[in-house]
Amino acid sequence: MFKEFLPFDTVRDDALKLAHKMYSEDGFVPDVIYCSLRGGAYMANVISEYYKIAHRSHHPVLFAAVVARSYTDVRKSTSRVYVDGWTYPPANLRPGDRIMLVDDIFDTGKTINALVDILLDYGMNREDIKVVVHDYKEDSRREKLSVIPDYYCRKIVVNTPEEDRWIHYMSHELVGLSADELEKHYFSKDSELKRILKPLFGENENKNG
């Protein structure tokens, strides 16, 4: 496995292009955009802004969030998905509401599948739920789940450990960085960040990524 550093503006630009496809080409307008916190927040905000402008003469698209977690750190995955809450409870959804569920990555797929199952339990139709991610990992070594992304910016096909990657989203992630990675991707671009971040990471950070 290798680590990829994905710039925030790449995610932003890709999200705008994907929003244009969904709206202008496919005619999909959600009633509710749910961002899966934390990872989906940046991309969901960009998509929401697109709809605010493109769909401004029609009913507003509600922006909401759900707090769900299955990852504990960069190398460990919990055995289950925890859903801490929704800012717009699924109980408030009406039959026929169109829902967009946004996350940064579909990796194991456990989080997305758990959230879609909850929405289905509240009577939503699967065809009215669109799963949107920046990165869709299709890993042949894993069991295929019932829910996969409807829209994605990149599809990453993984058949071997060497083909796998850990994607570091520079829009919102700091945990798990080595001293060398901090220097290359942060301090070299803005020297003041060294003064701010180095004390937080300490002197004992691993020098190698």
Model-identified regions with their sequence ranges:
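Structural beta-sheet core signal
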Residues: 33, 65, 101, 131-133
